[in-house]
């Protein structure tokens, strides 16, 4: 039985590269995090404090994988149909897809994201 399960698990096709040039921006418990896919790798974009104020910071988080239902980035799983974000079993959020880097970059409107901040 275990052998059957292992053979079944490893025969499921997993792909990368098919979403290169596209990105998603997710809202996870009020925080904004984006992932842009290029060269079979995922790059994480977050808003962080810089020298003169908030800025978007890029970090290579490694290879990504896809199947017909999900995108996998390390311990993150994103449903391709409804763009639901899940990290481990507790961190959840919603994402929006972008077809190219310019539209993806435009999704990080820092002024709009902080307009309701009290301090």
Predicted features, each with a name:
Residues 46, 86-87, 112-113:
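Extended soluble regions of mature proteins
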Residues 32, 50-82, 88-101:
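Contiguous, well-ordered beta-strand patches that form the walls/edges
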Residues 27-49:
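N-terminal targeting signals for Sec/Tat export/insertion, comprising classic cleavable signal peptides
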Residues 18-32, 95:
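Tryptophan-anchored aromatic micro-motifs
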Residues 1-2:
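Bacterial N-terminal signal peptides that target proteins for export
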Residues 90-119:
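C-terminal partner/receptor-binding element of secreted or periplasmic proteins
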Residues 11-13:
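N-terminal signal peptide c-region/cleavage motif recognized by signal peptidases
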């Amino acid at each position: 039985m275990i052998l059957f399960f292992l053979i079944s698990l490893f025969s499921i096709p997993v792909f990368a590269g098919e979403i290169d040039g596209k990105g998603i921006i997710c809202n996870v418990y009020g925080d904004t995090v984006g992932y842009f896919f290029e060269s079979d790798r995922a790059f994480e974009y977050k808003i962080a404090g810089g020298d003169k104020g908030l800025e978007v910071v890029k970090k290579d988080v490694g290879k990504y994988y896809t199947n017909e239902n999900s995108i996998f980035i390390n311990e993150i799983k994103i449903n391709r149909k409804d763009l639901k974000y899940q990290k481990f079993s507790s961190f959840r959020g919603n994402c929006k897809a972008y077809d190219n880097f310019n539209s993806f970059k435009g999704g990080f409107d820092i002024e709009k994201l902080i307009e309701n901040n009290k301090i």
